[in-house]
């Protein structure tokens, strides 16, 4: 558990940051220059707050009022930078050992074999960094940080220097870390795709302040955060459980707050919790439920709000939850002409036709033998 409440004047930017981060991945998201990296730098002890308090697992790392400011090497945090920062003269095996040797043997709870297996780097152990791809370097850097048996793992845009292919290579490994090692992760990014793939908790930072924080699905559903509005086209995220299988038609049934959804076959046990991403561009709206249509997932919904047109398109904020039940927020991106022709207004009941969706973080699950 990370509990942080700090102040820092950084040039013209006044940082006032307070939030709690529990198990799993907590993503710090915001525009460049918002103060995200400054936050993890203060947690690591690389920069000093002007005041406040930082606590990790009940261990006080900084307390301005009590004069506590532990040196970085005494904080037991792992840090993964944008670039791997591996020692070029050492092999991968020796780089990993550097992280492990910083911790007394009695305090180590992460084993080298486990890290090598999880990150898929057994074939790289005798290579030097110059012989590694960008994605391989980042996996080794993650392994070195893990082998320091940290209380928390700090990741400062670790995929920013990688192309899309290398990002896709590394993301599944990061996604598995919290469950495999029970290490909380503080993850800095301004890439929404990464946040949707990894985060359990989202902390939105704007101009040095926490604009919102909480479970990812709840923060994504908030309509009152202007700095976040442009990100909604990335899609809504809906919590779901594997509820059944339609074997003859090759589909898996997912139970969501909005009802059952059909998706591709997935090899996960019944009851497994997953999350579904539904892009705004993949939702069409109808006033009546279509009878003969190829779209398999159709949800009744209420229009909560309609955005202003931009380049001929606008965003429609929907609640697909049951009447009187928990909300299930979705966004649809439609043309201004469609709004006019359908007479769409807030409060109107419509049907949301979901043309596509993607499963998030299914690779997190430890698969049971079948």
Swiss-Prot record:
Cellular component GO terms held in the UniProt record: plasma membrane
Main location: membrane
EC number: 7.3.2.5
ABC transporter domain segment(s): 1-232
GO molecular function: ABC-type molybdate transporter activity; ATP binding; ATP hydrolysis activity
Domain Mop positions: 292-363
Group of enzyme by EC: translocase
Residues bound to ATP: 30-37
Catalyzed reactions: molybdate(out) + ATP + H2O = molybdate(in) + ADP + phosphate + H(+)
Short name of one Pfam family: ABC_tran
Bilayer topology: Peripheral membrane protein
This protein's UniProt keywords: ATP-binding, Cell inner membrane, Cell membrane, Membrane, Molybdenum, Nucleotide-binding, Translocase, Transport
Highest rank taxon of the organism: Bacteria
Family: Belongs to the ABC transporter superfamily. Molybdate importer (TC 3.A.1.8) family.
Known role: Part of the ABC transporter complex ModABC involved in molybdenum import. Responsible for energy coupling to the transport system.
PANTHER family, per the entry: ABC TRANSPORTER I FAMILY MEMBER 10
Quaternary structure and interacting proteins, as annotated: The complex is composed of two ATP-binding proteins (ModC), two transmembrane proteins (ModB) and a solute-binding protein (ModA).
The name this protein goes by in its record: Molybdenum import ATP-binding protein ModC
Species whose genome carries this gene: Rhodospirillum rubrum (strain ATCC 11170 / ATH 1.1.1 / DSM 467 / LMG 4362 / NCIMB 8255 / S1)
Lineage of source species: Bacteria, Pseudomonadati, Pseudomonadota, Alphaproteobacteria, Rhodospirillales
